[in-house]
């Protein structure tokens, strides 16, 4: 099956009449009228949003989004609300949201002040550090050790933008290759086409864990900014964003998010960071990395 055109639909329901707060929210009104909520997912963003062995979208962000869907079903009194899952990429995820193709984007999208000009973000659900992965044999111990080398980062991400800015500011003279997705970027390091792959640490851990020989690779911290992740929603729909935030914050307050976190990150041996603990204790949708120090 071609995952680029993968489309999953669960349950079936005739279109619903708008109900209550749905009339105050364009997104809720659309969902109520069509009887469908459309979720954008990534196919290779382990452990946030990816396809499992049965080619079904799964992951930390997907699980959070299904909890949001439960809250929407409750708000609309529509227990049979249909969920449609659509694959998105770094290149088209914003356009899909702006054009109404997806109602929630559930992947590993970093909340930035620049992106907030086009879309809105839920309260932060994860805080990643920007790191690099290289083969241990290369003995790379810092971003500066890559000076004059060919490196790769995923196109359309905040990591590749930060890498370019830092390389220029520090005179690192890097040849930066944009990978189409995380898997392609990592494969360039595997094939020695790039000395290192610069990306969010948690995504690198997922890729290394799935590699043929994980022991060949080292993940190294950098001085690039942290990356706060959130669920993407449409801008200028505060009623819908409020519902999304309330569903996530409920998981924070109940402590259930701890169990969900362990489910997806314990296999990668990634304990919850102080920055994420802070964001859970005091929920925020800030796109400023300084807010997570």
Residue ranges and their predicted role:
Residues 38, 44-47, 57-74, 110, ...:
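Bilobed "Venus flytrap"/periplasmic-binding protein-like clamshell domains
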Residues 92, 106-117, 161-169, 188-225, ...:
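A ligand-binding cleft/hinge motif common to bilobed small-molecule-binding domains
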Residues 66, 77-145, 285-292:
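Acidic, polar ligand-binding/catalytic clefts
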Residues 62-71, 137, 144-145, 149-150, ...:
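Extended ligand-binding regions for polar small-molecule ligands
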Residues 24, 78-95, 138, 176-188, ...:
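Short helix-initiation/N-cap motifs at beta->coil->alpha
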Residues 24-105:
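Extracytoplasmic small-molecule ligand-binding "clamshell" domains
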Residues 8-15:
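Bacterial N-terminal signal peptides
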Residues 43, 126-137, 201, 209-248, ...:
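Periplasmic-binding protein-like
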């Amino acid at each position: 099956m071609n995952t680029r055109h993968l489309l999953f639909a669960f349950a079936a329901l005739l279109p619903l009449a708008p109900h209550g707060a749905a009339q105050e929210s364009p997104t809720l009104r659309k969902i109520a009228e069509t009887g469908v909520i459309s979720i954008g997912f990534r196919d290779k963003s382990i452990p946030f949003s990816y396809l499992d062995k049965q080619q079904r979208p799964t992951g930390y962000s997907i699980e959070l989004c299904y909890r949001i869907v439960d809250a929407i079903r409750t708000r609309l009194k529509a227990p049979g609300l249909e969920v449609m899952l659509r694959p998105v990429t770094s290149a088209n995820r914003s356009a899909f949201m702006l054009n109404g193709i997806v109602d929630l984007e559930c992947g590993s999208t970093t909340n930035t002040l620049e992106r907030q000009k086009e879309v809105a973000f839920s309260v932060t659900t994860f805080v990643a550090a920007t790191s690099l992965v290289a083969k241990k044999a290369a003995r790379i111990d810092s971003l500066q050790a890559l000076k004059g080398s060919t490196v790769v980062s995923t196109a359309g991400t905040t990591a590749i933008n930060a890498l370019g800015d830092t390389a220029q500011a520090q005179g690192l003279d890097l040849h930066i290759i944009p990978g189409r997705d995380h898997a392609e970027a990592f494969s360039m390091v595997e094939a020695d086409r790039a000395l290192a792959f610069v990306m969010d640490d948690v995504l690198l851990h997922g890729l290394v864990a799935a590699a043929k020989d994980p022991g060949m690779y080292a993940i190294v911290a950098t001085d690039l900014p942290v990356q706060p992740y959130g669920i993407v929603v449409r801008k200028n729909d505060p009623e819908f964003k409020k519902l999304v935030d309330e569903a996530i914050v409920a998981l924070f307050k109940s402590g259930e998010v701890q169990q969900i976190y362990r489910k997806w990150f314990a296999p990668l041996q990634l304990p919850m960071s102080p920055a994420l603990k802070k964001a859970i204790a005091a929920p925020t949708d800030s796109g400023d990395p300084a807010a997570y120090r």
